[in-house]
Amino acid sequence: MTQSIDSMSISIYENLISTMIQDIVSREVVHQKQMQSRYPQLKQYSIDPNGNIDINGNTKQQDSSQYFHCKNCGRDVSANRFAAHLQRCLNSRQRR
């Protein structure tokens, strides 16, 4: 009797999981078809295992090649150091 209850519960569980997976897949298929009909020029995201391109297929720029002008002190600061610079720059201004 225990074995039949166990097999019955496993069968019910597998049936529920299968139904949920089928529901998710069918919803996603309908969603993809709607997106393709609304936006026919829509292109998929690019995946680069080397990390040389972004999700839109464009080559990544080096962060050190971009500079921002700090309006507080007037210096040009590298993009990858701008947040740290701004914090120091604003804190030193408040002390005065």
UniProtKB/Swiss-Prot annotation:
Zn-finger (SGF11-type) intervals are 68-89
Say yes or no: keyword Cell inner membrane present. Answer: no
Q: Where are the transmembrane segments?
A: none
> Biological process (GO) annotations?
chromatin organization; regulation of transcription by RNA polymerase II
Please state where this protein is localized: Nucleus
An MF annotation (GO) of this entry: zinc ion binding
Q: Name one Pfam family in it.
A: Sgf11
* Keywords of this entry: Activator, Chromatin regulator, Metal-binding, Nucleus, Transcription, Transcription regulation, Zinc, Zinc-finger
InterPro entries per the UniProt record, alphabetical = SAGA_su_Sgf11, Sgf11_N
Q: Which GO terms describe its cellular component?
A: DUBm complex; SAGA complex; SLIK (SAGA-like) complex
User: Which residues lie in coiled coils?
Assistant: none
Coarsely, its chief localization is nucleus
Q: Which family does it belong to?
A: Belongs to the SGF11 family.
Write out the domain note: The long N-terminal helix forms part of the 'assembly lobe' of the SAGA deubiquitination module.
Outline the subunit composition: Component of the 1.8 MDa SAGA transcription coactivator-HAT complex. SAGA is built of 5 distinct domains with specialized functions. Within the SAGA complex, SUS1, SGF11, SGF73 and UBP8 form an additional subcomplex of SAGA called the DUB module (deubiquitination module). Interacts directly with SGF73, SUS1 and UBP8.
Q: What does this protein do?
A: Functions as a component of the transcription regulatory histone acetylation (HAT) complex SAGA. At the promoters, SAGA is required for recruitment of the basal transcription machinery. It influences RNA polymerase II transcriptional activity through different activities such as TBP interaction and promoter selectivity, interaction with transcription activators, and chromatin modification through histone acetylation and deubiquitination. SAGA acetylates nucleosomal histone H3 to some extent (to form H3K9ac, H3K14ac, H3K18ac and H3K23ac).
Q: List the protein's name.
A: SAGA-associated factor 11
The protein's organism comes out as Vanderwaltozyma polyspora (strain ATCC 22028 / DSM 70294 / BCRC 21397 / CBS 2163 / NBRC 10782 / NRRL Y-8283 / UCD 57-17) (Kluyveromyces polysporus)
Q: Give the taxonomic lineage as stored in the record.
A: Eukaryota, Fungi, Dikarya, Ascomycota, Saccharomycotina
